[in-house]
Amino acid sequence: GIMDTLKNLAKTAGKGALQSLVKMASCKLSGQC
């Protein structure tokens, strides 16, 4: 249903945000930004 779709969208968006945060953090830590 609609709720399931929204939940899946939220999960996907959350994963994307987490991944970009991790990438930024590791890039800054390694000084490769």
Swiss-Prot record:
Signal peptide: none annotated. It is found in: Secreted. It comes from the Eukaryota. One of its GO terms (biological process) is killing of cells of another organism. One of its GO terms (cellular component) is extracellular region. Pfam families: Antimicrobial_2. Disulfide bonds join 27-33. Keywords: Amphibian defense peptide, Antibiotic, Antimicrobial, Cytolysis, Disulfide bond, Hemolysis, Secreted. Expressed by the skin glands. Belongs to the frog skin active peptide (FSAP) family. Brevinin subfamily. Shows antibacterial activity against representative Gram-negative and Gram-positive bacterial species, and hemolytic activity. This is Brevinin-2Ef. The lineage of its organism: Eukaryota, Metazoa, Chordata, Craniata, Vertebrata.
